[in-house]
């Protein structure tokens, strides 16, 4: 969430961010609720002072008539306090609800737009493969190479689940090890994170749906959720702590990710592209306010290194305002070339990285001391290192050959133990 003083001092800027994101939110209502809340708090303070004064007088040596009058006054004051405290409770609930809905402000260079066509393409890297045969999509390759089974998974678990089989199992593990080793070499602390988080941590990270439907699964009769990303559990690691940010704290977390993906059907969402469960390695950083932009660019650079070493053609996008989550000040996506996508080949999202400034740390009470010894809220940056399912799509589709097999990128061979997946009759 944003600092309330900042909101009051920059109402036009905050309203501009809300409008650019396509959100419906009455920021003036938030200011009104805050004013009303403060007024009630002042009234409660004044009534408590009167009540204390009344109680002090009752301890004096008084005649019965005056004492009875003071007792009656005390009852009235108590009733007024109870009513005001109940009103404060309701106003505070409404205020907190509205306050949490206010999104982060936007970086000045975020493209303003309401569709993916408004994302700004920064660059393209790599050569899109040209085949002298009709290429298959990853579903055909998964069947012909005995790597994927959606049919049995549908029977066992439902739609949008899958079995990885044979070489695909080692390919996923190789991608995880490849990315974790790279991040460890770059100074990240490496974690396997919980796949479950408490509701207040999920809320603190700011997973606010645009509508009424959350994209993550709640565990029935608990205050816990299955995580949609280890951003949630890494971000909550220092909940309510004052941390030492002499150097940025960089973390890499492996987790399974669970997402409802309600309504995500159609040609562009088929197969492994949009599923209910997948494995991912996430980058996360806690840093000082003045460092977050540099860290954000560093995360993008690491993502580019990963896909360059995987030999996968990709493009980098500066994401438009409408497609930013509430916590994000700025976001980059990398989209990899997928020859089987949309029947003719197109780019599909494989990573994102977001600078969330202090939006999440305010909710989670994560602070550091500046050079003057003052507590400041940490800035938080996140980014995908590897989301295995979509990278598997990219590898299968880009490196298939006329024999029906698939070459493994050289950077992965030492992790897979094989360099080629042959066609299976």
UniProtKB/Swiss-Prot annotation:
Localization, UniProt: Cytoplasm
Residues reported in the UniProt entry to bind L-serine: 229-231, 282, 384
UniProt cross-references to Pfam families, sorted A to Z: Seryl_tRNA_N (PF02403), tRNA-synt_2b (PF00587)
GO cellular component: cytoplasm
GO biological process, one term: seryl-tRNA aminoacylation
Enzyme class: ligase
EC nos: 6.1.1.11
A single GO molecular function term of this UniProt record: serine-tRNA ligase activity
Chief location category: cytoplasm
Pathway: Aminoacyl-tRNA biosynthesis; selenocysteinyl-tRNA(Sec) biosynthesis; L-seryl-tRNA(Sec) from L-serine and tRNA(Sec): step 1/1
Family matches, as PROSITE patterns: AA_TRNA_LIGASE_II (PS50862)
Catalytic activity: tRNA(Ser) + L-serine + ATP = L-seryl-tRNA(Ser) + AMP + diphosphate + H(+); tRNA(Sec) + L-serine + ATP = L-seryl-tRNA(Sec) + AMP + diphosphate + H(+)
Keyword set, alphabetical order: Aminoacyl-tRNA synthetase, ATP-binding, Cytoplasm, Ligase, Nucleotide-binding, Protein biosynthesis
Complex and partners: Homodimer. The tRNA molecule binds across the dimer.
Role of this protein: Catalyzes the attachment of serine to tRNA(Ser). Is also able to aminoacylate tRNA(Sec) with serine, to form the misacylated tRNA L-seryl-tRNA(Sec), which will be further converted into selenocysteinyl-tRNA(Sec).
Family as reported in the entry's similarity comment: Belongs to the class-II aminoacyl-tRNA synthetase family. Type-1 seryl-tRNA synthetase subfamily.
Domain notes: Consists of two distinct domains, a catalytic core and a N-terminal extension that is involved in tRNA binding.
Record's protein name: Serine--tRNA ligase
